[in-house]
Amino acid sequence: MIGGDTRAASAHPGMASAQGPVATPSPEQPFPGTTSVSLARPVLRVWHGAHSSGLLPNLIAQHSPAMAQNGAVPSEATKKDQNLTRGNWGNQIEFVLTSVGYAVGLGNVWRFPYLCYRNGGGAFMFPYFIMLIFCGIPLFFMELSFGQFASQGCLGVWRISPMFKGVGYGMMVVSTYIGIYYNVVICIAFYYFFSSMTHVLPWAYCNNPWNTPDCAGVLDASNLTNGSRPAALSGNLSHLFNYTLQRTSPSEEYWRLYVLKLSDDIGNFGEVRLPLLGCLGVSWVVVFLCLIRGVKSSGKVVYFTATFPYVVLTILFVRGVTLEGAFTGIMYYLTPQWDKILEAKVWGDAASQIFYSLGCAWGGLITMASYNKFHNNCYRDSVIISITNCATSVYAGFVIFSILGFMANHLGVDVSRVADHGPGLAFVAYPEALTLLPISPLWSLLFFFMLILLGLGTQFCLLETLVTAIVDEVGNEWILQKKTYVTLGVAVAGFLLGIPLTSQAGIYWLLLMDNYAASFSLVVISCIMCVSIMYIYGHRNYFQDIQMMLGFPPPLFFQICWRFVSPAIIFFILIFTVIQYRPITYNHYQYPGWAVAIGFLMALSSVICIPLYALFQLCRTDGDTLLQRLKNATKPSRDWGPALLEHRTGRYAPTTTPSPEDGFEVQPLHPDKAQIPIVGSNGSSRFQDSRI
């Protein structure tokens, strides 16, 4: 008879659980958990400790569909979710597009092409893809499987080993820093986007009030690198001095003297640039509205934000390759310098770019995967998303260097003279090149709209990471129903913290945060995550978890990478980062020592969470000796495992019958009324008697 059977003993000591009604899947059911089962007289059985474990809301939600996040009455889409408490993606395309939007960000456009040409052109592709295969994809798969198995954000997943929960807090700190300054970059892109809505781009000529005598526009003259100027000295004597003109482009002066009104020092904040402040507000409002219903709303938005940038890239590519000099720029980008492969710096740059561009150790991958259905094939997703991210970087290089080659040809200089990276490429070099094109405002609108969408795709996940971590950690019914208010609170806090970055010294602080807040701290966090899962929790346990979730264990290649290769590469990146460290500069400005010290404090603020929380956990863990406390603090908590009872099979299966003291009365099914409606994937249903 269906119901009343017992399952295998749990591997976690102290976990007591109840037997419950179990529905036998019909032949039409492709995966466990895809059939909706309801009982005429539902019986809710929980084990002792479920109240504090975070699993109780999930159990209640399975029997009480009226409870959903944000307090809304469940829609038809919500009713199809496996996890009614947290919700799931509407479909798997939404998850893939969101993850692509998260991984493919501004760095793919303004950092990778520059690294490629600086490190040997096409030869750089070899170490780049080697690092992708041995480090990027394995780490990506690990984080996706980690979040999907537990259906928890970057804090909740550390039930796997509570002593290392500080890793999750470190991820939250990193995401906070990045979310603050990343939206400022988006707001600047918004500003340029609005400024492009004109007949003549404001950075095209040197006849504006903010321009200096050194300004020389590419539309006014060409080949202005060298020049001569007569100067009269001592009465009748005149000399002709040949000198090098210090050309300042109108786009650079527009950026430095008009948009930023850049101060002379990081400590001289000056005034808040009100136009940038307004654009920052617009940016945060857009992010909040897109996340107002969590993944249910953002999952719909990414159909546009994650795909349209590829349309724009293709349009710019087609336009770029038709320009004179474009081939020279592309060859400069791709021509291999094979001797560079022997340089450690090239391999270090390749490893760092893979690591940072995929968004590993930010917490976003764990968070996005936590909204997947339990049996989703995240192995397939990790390969698709990682390769898409890297292919986008390579493709963006063609777009960037075709235009830069055209500008270099127009000016009569080498491509290296116009190539740049970071904000210098996005807001100075590329906008200047666009002024040379017919209908330049149109191309400018497309370019900055693409930057906005690329930035928003990453920003969505950064904000959702923080919100999900807070909601999962508190875990009570009130905060589950008020998740929208949590999202609003985080967005308002992010806006307020971003205001100093819109001041005249804002760009100094933005680059300081970019260089220190998410640099070596990410490497440390990722390394500790690998070690804690593979060697503290145990690689065999984790491989069994993945097999239970996916139906197959991780391939041998990934097992080897997780245990040996990827940690070694991460350690190499850490050593490389330390060896290659140089004090931060912006153009010719050298940051003062106190500013660099603040940068190091930002970097340490995320890493320090790990030992501090470990010490806290040791102090609150039972044990007669330090070794016993250490053992108890690192073993999985009893609520570690799949969030839903229907997925807690094998060593996670409930085994014992609870008593009424556990919080719920156990009532037997009435043999005449126990019917199970089996709902198929196409919406059809049939009733099956529970008796054999």
Swiss-Prot record:
Residues 1-34 are annotated as: Disordered. It is found in: Cell membrane. It is a multi-pass membrane protein. Keywords: Amino-acid transport, Cell membrane, Membrane, Neurotransmitter transport, Phosphoprotein, Symport, Transmembrane, Transmembrane helix, Transport. The chain crosses the membrane at residues 95-115, 122-142, 174-194, 272-292, 301-321, 346-366, 393-413, 436-456, 492-512, 516-536, 556-576, 596-616. InterPro entries: Na/ntran_symport (IPR000175), Na/ntran_symport_glycine_GLY1 (IPR003028), SNS_sf (IPR037272). Residues 1-94, 617-692 are cytoplasmic. The modification Phosphothreonine is found at T657. One of its GO terms (cellular component) is apical plasma membrane. GO terms for molecular function: glycine transmembrane transporter activity; glycine:sodium symporter activity. Sodium- and chloride-dependent glycine transporter which is essential for regulating glycine concentrations at inhibitory glycinergic synapses. Interacts with EXOC1; interaction increases the transporter capacity of SLC6A9 probably by promoting its insertion into the cell membrane. Interacts with EXOC3 and EXOC4. Belongs to the sodium:neurotransmitter symporter (SNF) (TC 2.A.22) family. SLC6A9 subfamily. This is Sodium- and chloride-dependent glycine transporter 1. It comes from Mus musculus. The gene is Slc6a9.
